[in-house]
Amino acid sequence: MFKMVSSPHTHSSNLTAKFMLWVMVAMLPALGMQAYFFGYGVFIQVFIALLLAVAIEIAIAKLRRKLTAFYVADLSGVLTALILAMSIPPYAPYWIIVIGIIVALLLAKHSYGGLGQNLFNPAMVAYALLLVSFPVQMTGWLVPIDLLNEPPTFGDAISLVFSGVTSDGFSVHQLLGSVDGIAQATPLDSAKTSMQKLGVEGVLQSPIFSGLFANGWWQINLAFLAGGLLLIYKSIIHWQIPAAMLGMFALLSGLTDLLLPHTHLNVVSQLFSGAMMFGAFFIATDPVTASITPRGKLIFGGLIGLFVYLIRYYGNYPDAVAFSVLLANICVPLIDHYTQPRLYGSGR
């Protein structure tokens, strides 16, 4: 005898926690690269973020009289914390990540009803708010430690995060100023501030674009690319969004190089600088805030690529992934409405 039950009659073993865990595993190579090139501050920021995220998820569960495991075990808050911690400068003051996690989880996630209800990517809401509110702290990226005369020790890293200075009394900006030829800490920052004075050739000859230094951001982006390809292979994310985002940006950047040569960094340098690969594979592909239709995913990814291009090339911010993702999130309901697959046998 067969037992009569309602649908669904088949079940998938893919739970939310499993998906989140795979995403975090895919981020580990990039996390290791960030720590290798920027030091212990990366791990300190991640530790603070994860600890606070778990505490907030437990508190929300108790306030809503839910089982603690209901909010913590799905790992969504933990993943949000990891993404935000890897997005901010490793030696930013501790209160930056504290404010960011509170904004991401309380304002951008749980105020909408929790997982699956939020309209905007929580980590990017927090990042954008931090960048606008605290621009000095959010642009305090150190150069890779190989270029520093005295790389921060573990004790220095703790001191920088919690007091703002090393044990010898040096701030992040003082450490950055000890490196000749560096105006800002990241390649995009340096190119944005130095392009008019030095030109493309002069920028590319600076320490930030030559030798091991240049390989720092390239290798971090390559690590994100490798992790993203793993997620596509495991069917954790779909290929349409990253392909459309990177393709649109590369197309527009390439056309700019042809029409206005020697005015901006080349396409490859743009693709492997900043948060491009991070955004394409780990941020834009958020299943809650991204488009859900096949054609919609292509449009959504293409929009992000377009916004990144416009802001990077013509805006005031050297990197633009956070703002681009949030702008595209606004368009998702409209995109999904007009890209619903046609039912078999129905008219267009």
Curated annotation (Swiss-Prot):
It is found in: Cell inner membrane. It comes from the Bacteria. Keywords: Cell inner membrane, Cell membrane, Electron transport, Flavoprotein, FMN, Membrane, Phosphoprotein, Translocase, Transmembrane, Transmembrane helix, Transport. One of its GO terms (biological process) is transmembrane transport. GO terms for cellular component: plasma membrane. The keyword Protein biosynthesis does not apply. The modification FMN phosphoryl threonine is found at T186. Pfam families: NQR2_RnfD_RnfE. Signal peptide: none annotated. It is a multi-pass membrane protein. Its cofactor is FMN. The chain crosses the membrane at residues 15-35, 36-56, 67-87, 88-108, 125-145, 212-232, 241-261, 265-285, 298-318, 320-340. Its EC number is 7.-.-.-. Part of a membrane-bound complex that couples electron transfer with translocation of ions across the membrane. The complex is composed of six subunits: RnfA, RnfB, RnfC, RnfD, RnfE and RnfG. Belongs to the NqrB/RnfD family. This is Ion-translocating oxidoreductase complex subunit D. The lineage of its organism: Bacteria, Pseudomonadati, Pseudomonadota, Gammaproteobacteria, Pasteurellales. The gene is rnfD.
